Structures are given as structure tokens and as C-alpha cells.
Amino acid sequence: MAKPAARPRKKVKKTVVDGIAHIHASFNNTIVTITDRQGNALSWATSGGSGFRGSRKSTPFAAQVAAERAGQAALEYGLKNLDVNVKGPGPGRESAVRALNGCGYKIASITDVTPIPHNGCRPPKKRRV
């Protein structure tokens, strides 16, 4: 005899007050991930996933839209305070931080965590246009 189908349990959303926003701004794209203090991802968004393709992905406006999408999705967890870690040299650094501030979060600190080589790999050759 077949077992009766188990009822799917409703997933209870945990409430998180403090979180960390990781903004990775490269020359081609911007990735915004909002995590709790332990590093568990609550929400994320990218410029490419927000509907921008090609060279429009690397604009400050695309980074702003991605940060707004990630910020609105993380509001469901009851997030209030954010520490912001910014990594990379891309054009969407400041606009992503401003967009998170506009979502209603209290930003406690902004930290630049861009990795800087101590004369590591050879950089790419310069563009000739």
C-alpha cells in the first residue's frame, strides 16, 4: 500500500536584524549579495540578471537597479542595519551603496575590500583603440 503524500511544511523565514552587503563591481558587471553576519546569503542580484546586457551591464545605473532588487528582497527578513563591503574597480561602486541607502537600511560602515597584489600576476596589456 502506498504511503499518503506528506504535506509540504511552510518554510519559516528567519528574522535577521544586522547584515552585510557585498558589492563586487568589476569592469563588466556588478554583483550585490546581502548576507547575515555568518555569511549565509539572504538575497542577491546582478546587473546582467536585472535585464541589462552587453556594455549596459557595466553602467552605474545597472548597479543601482541590482542593488535595489537585492535590497528589496532582503527586506523580507526584517533586515535593518547593513555593513557594506565593496570590492573591485568597477563603475557601479558608489551608485550601489547609494541605492542600498535609499532602500531604508541604516548603513553602519563602508569598507573597501579590493584585493591588492604585492606585485603578483602580470596585468593585462593596455588597450589600443
Curated annotation (Swiss-Prot):
The keyword rRNA-binding applies. One of its GO terms (cellular component) is ribosome. Keywords: Ribonucleoprotein, Ribosomal protein, RNA-binding, rRNA-binding. The keyword RNA-binding applies. GO terms for biological process: translation. InterPro entries: Ribosomal_uS11, Ribosomal_uS11_bac-type, Ribosomal_uS11_CS, Ribosomal_uS11_sf. Pfam families: Ribosomal_S11. PROSITE patterns: RIBOSOMAL_S11. It comes from the Bacteria. One of its GO terms (molecular function) is rRNA binding. HAMAP family: Ribosomal_uS11. NCBIfam families: PRK05309.1, uS11_bact. Belongs to the universal ribosomal protein uS11 family. Located on the platform of the 30S subunit, it bridges several disparate RNA helices of the 16S rRNA. Forms part of the Shine-Dalgarno cleft in the 70S ribosome. Part of the 30S ribosomal subunit. Interacts with proteins S7 and S18. Binds to IF-3. This is Small ribosomal subunit protein uS11. The lineage of its organism: Bacteria, Pseudomonadati, Pseudomonadota, Gammaproteobacteria, Pseudomonadales.
